[in-house]
């Protein structure tokens, strides 16, 4: 779908060139051409630039800017898309949004993504100060037409200051339709390394968070977990008393969304290596507490929040996960290198 007829023509030509027959290219505004249809997957790369100078000729370049003020176009687009999804269907979009000094970016976006009958995950990939954003916008515009950079920059920055725009955030938005329970909204910083495909990772984290975020500790302790594939430990050591001593440790994921988990202490490291998909978390924590001669309550208070966080970012998985359920009990986990 595209409003631009040339874009539709190019897409159709590329489909024919690559012998793809299962693609339909339609011209129209937003969802109007498919208003009677529902989808399992919607992927969108909208014109998400936030124009610092609404009166600028840049508005003619609709591939970059919607022509609407601020970030309302993309926020409204996401709200519309939610109603075009089948149950468990996904919507993916890259977009930018306004950030102000008076309000946290997550608090500002949350109302826009509420009441959609969808779980929502927003990953911030970066942010630019108002000065940097306006400067970059002016530089890009100069490549398209002869413009007075200084005058354009001054107008753009004045517009941002007038509307109290301190910075512009950019990121990825994913919705998954779910009408059978209360929905959840998650905001995160994206990992720096997104060089590999991570679609399956996104789907997996939706499943994990939807199931376990609201699970009481008592039920969480009954679960059996294992270290997820492609997890490694990176340790930093320093010389002390004639030997190397570990002074910092972190877990990292080598595939998908390559998150890292810093500040891994010896107690957390040990319990993670013992996750074998065979014993419950309570059983493992009980044994660890006895071996360390520590009160079980203290071990649980210390480790449970960290283990929940590891689960939310995919470092550990429930034993019922498809890629773990067939793993033999003697399998070793890639928890260190």
Which residues are covered by each model-predicted region?
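S-adenosylmethionine
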Residues: 3-12, 17-146
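Short, solvent-exposed loop/helix junctions and linker helices
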Residues: 36, 67-71, 166, 261, ...
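Phosphate/oxyanion-binding loops and surfaces in catalytic or ligand/nucleic-acid-binding neighborhoods
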Residues: 49, 112-116, 178, 278, ...
């Amino acid at each position: 779908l595209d409003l631009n007829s040339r874009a539709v023509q190019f897409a159709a030509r590329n489909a024919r060139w690559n012998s793809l027959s299962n693609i339909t290219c339609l011209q129209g505004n937003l969802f109007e051409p498919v208003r009677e249809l529902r989808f399992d997957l919607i992927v969108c790369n909208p014109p998400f630039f936030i124009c610092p100078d609404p009166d600028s000729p840049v508005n003619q370049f609709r591939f970059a800017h919607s022509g609407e003020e601020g970030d309302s176009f993309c926020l409204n687009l996401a709200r519309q898309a939610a109603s075009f999804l089948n149950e468990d269907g996904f919507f993916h979009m890259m977009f930018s949004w306004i950030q102000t000094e008076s309000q946290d970016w997550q608090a500002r976006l949350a109302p826009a993504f509420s009441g959609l009958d969808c779980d929502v995950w927003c990953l911030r990939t970066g942010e630019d100060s108002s000065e940097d954003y306006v400067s970059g916008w002016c530089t890009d515009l100069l490549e398209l037409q002869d413009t007075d950079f200084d005058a354009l920059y001054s107008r753009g920055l004045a517009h941002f200051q007038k509307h109290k725009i301190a910075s512009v955030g950019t990121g990825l938005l994913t919705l998954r339709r779910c009408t059978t329970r209360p929905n959840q909204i998650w905001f995160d910083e994206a990992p720096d390394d997104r060089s590999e495909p991570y679609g399956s990772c996104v789907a997996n984290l939706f499943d994990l968070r939807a199931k376990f975020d609201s699970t009481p500790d008592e039920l969480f302790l009954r679960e059996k977990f294992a270290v997820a594939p492609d997890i490694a430990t990176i340790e930093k050591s320093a010389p002390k008393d004639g030997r190397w001593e570990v002074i910092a440790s972190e877990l990292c994921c080598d595939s998908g969304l390559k998150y890292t988990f810093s500040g891994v202490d010896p107690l957390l490291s040990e319990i993670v290596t013992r996750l074998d998909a065979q014993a419950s978390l309570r059983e493992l924590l009980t044994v660890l507490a006895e071996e360390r001669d520590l009160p079980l309550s203290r071990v649980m208070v210390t480790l449970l929040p960290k283990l929940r966080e590891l689960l939310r970012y995919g470092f550990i998985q429930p034993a019922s996960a498809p890629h773990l359920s067939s793993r033999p009990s003697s399998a070793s986990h890639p928890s260190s290198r």
